[in-house]
Amino acid sequence: MLGPDQFRDVSDFQVPQVVLRLEKVIPSDPTLLNDAVAEITAELDCAACWDDVEIIGLVVREALANAIVHGNHCDPEKTVSISVAVNEDCDLLMSVKDSGAGFDPSALPNPIAAENLLAPHGRGIFLIRQLMDEVDFKFDHGTEVRMRRRQNWLE
């Protein structure tokens, strides 16, 4: 194990090449959500890496909806950006960024707790965390949700 002032030489690491990259910026208008999700999932479907592109579409929908509704409060003057990359190993890397003030992910209520089961909101981040291998948040001039799903995530 390396100490706090030691660094591993990463020059010999093999980094898979990106074979598909999508970047899209949309106004924070919920009526544009379906078209944006359809466009992104169609491109990913063409990459032919997954049999379950619908699940990835659900993640895209939830991440974009959270950014539009909760991050930017449906203000069409504010934008949401999404960046999607697929590498040669068919790993999916995705980032969704809004202009919102941010939030504390650890403070989100448990959506499967009895008192929250019928709540109209509160399942998006939970679903994203369940369906992706890695999810983290960055708060710098907005909120960025960064997600990764490995091709072999079910193995």
PLM feature spans:
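Helix-loop-beta hinge of the Bergerat
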Residues: 17-50
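Conserved short strand/loop->alpha-helix "switch" segment adjacent to the catalytic nucleotide/phosphoryl-transfer site
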Residues: 38-65, 117-119
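Conserved beta-strand-loop-beta-strand hairpin that lines the nucleotide-binding pocket
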Residues: 1-24, 68-155
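Short, structured helix-loop boundary elements
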Residues: 30-34, 53, 57, 77, ...
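Alpha-helical macromolecular-interaction surfaces
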Residues: 35, 55-58, 91, 130
